[in-house]
Amino acid sequence: MLSIFKNLLGTSEEDGTTQEANSKDTKGLKEERKRKKRKNKYKIPPGHTQQDWDALVASGKNLSGVESPISVTAEELAKHCSPDDCWMAIRGKVYNVTAYLPYHPVGPKKILKHSGVDATKPYLKHHDWVNEEELLKTSFVGYLV
């Protein structure tokens, strides 16, 4: 009979803890994880918001590093995978994303991870709603061949 009341009250016979206490512990762990996640978030440098990037693109400044579109082989693309020279292909188009690195909302590491290669699959997995042609129109290098 006592075990029935303990079950109704949410008390564990094994350790005497209540479900309420366990719930608080779980809540505390979740809050701690959230704090750590916020603490580790990338902080966008001043002057590098999405609006700042949009203004740079609207200025018409050529950020591609080439005067006119070129044909880019996979071998050539692979040479451009550093923070100082970062290209990636998305949907058959190659972009010089070097200038965009400090503007990316989660930081340059995510872009650099996929630089120098055809990044279409990972790009679409995380950015299927983003119009990369508009976002990177002044960074267009050419076509992947």
Curated annotation (Swiss-Prot):
Keywords: Cytoplasm, Heme, Iron, Metal-binding, Phosphoprotein. GO terms for molecular function: cytochrome-b5 reductase activity, acting on NAD(P)H; heme binding; metal ion binding. Disulfide bonds: none annotated. Residues 22-32 have a biased composition (Basic and acidic residues). Heme binds at residues 104, 127. InterPro entries: Cyt_B5-like_heme/steroid-bd, Cyt_B5-like_heme/steroid_sf, Cytochrome_b5/Flavoprotein_Rdt. It is found in: Cytoplasm. The modification Phosphoserine is found at residue 68. One of its GO terms (cellular component) is cytoplasm. Residues 1-49 are annotated as: Disordered. Transmembrane segments: none annotated. SUPFAM superfamilies: Cytochrome b5-like heme/steroid binding domain. Its main location: cytoplasm. Residues 33-42 have a biased composition (Basic residues). The keyword Phosphoprotein applies. The keyword Heme applies. SMART domains: Cyt-b5. Residues 69-145 form the Cytochrome b5 heme-binding domain. Belongs to the cytochrome b5 family. This is Uncharacterized heme-binding protein C330.03c. It comes from Schizosaccharomyces pombe (strain 972 / ATCC 24843) (Fission yeast).
